[in-house]
């Protein structure tokens, strides 16, 4: 059985925004397990302005939904990438405040290179939930898909397109 939710809102510049969520019921055993979440945030030049500000807001809202015991980290990328922390952080109030401060400090510049942050995210081959926020149109999507197929068997990746031109 699916649980669904729809939220409509206006962006700061008056454009309509729609968020849809469809969640299957999951066994309690899976529900209670601690998870590791990685948030990959595109900070390339094309994300400047409302795209990046709305992405920041969305990531902060996602972080607030984590449970005690969950772990998380944030990877910001343009033509290179940086990691908020050298290791996954346990979700708690202090780390949430640090994450908000880090997210709000991000600035857009550079090109879009998605493969290297994905390689980093999947390096340990442990079970992770990866949320990818990008407006990118990449030329190496086959290489990215092939890498994820080979190395991402234990992880779930959820891409969020921040525009209508994402590939």
Task: State what each model feature region is.
Residues 1-167:
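Exposed acidic/Ser/Thr-rich ligand/metal-binding surfaces
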């Amino acid at each position: 059985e699916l649980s669904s939710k729809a939220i409509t809102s206006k962006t700061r510049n008056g454009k309509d925004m729609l968020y849809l969520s469809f969640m299957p019921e999951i066994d309690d055993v899976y529900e209670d397990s601690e998870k590791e979440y990685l948030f990959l945030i595109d900070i390339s030049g094309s994300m400047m302005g409302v795209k990046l500000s709305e992405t920041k807001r969305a990531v902060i809202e996602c972080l607030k939904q984590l449970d005690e015991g969950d772990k998380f980290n944030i990877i910001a990328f343009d033509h290179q990438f940086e990691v908020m922390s050298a290791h996954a952080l346990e979700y708690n109030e202090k780390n949430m405040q640090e994450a908000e401060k880090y997210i709000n400090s991000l600035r857009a510049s550079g090109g879009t290179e998605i493969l290297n942050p994905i390689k980093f995210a999947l390096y340990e081959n442990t079970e992770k939930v990866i949320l990818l926020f990008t407006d990118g149109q990449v030329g190496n999507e086959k290489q990215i898909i092939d890498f994820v197929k080979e190395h991402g068997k234990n992880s779930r990746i959820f891409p969020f397109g921040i525009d209508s031109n994402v590939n």
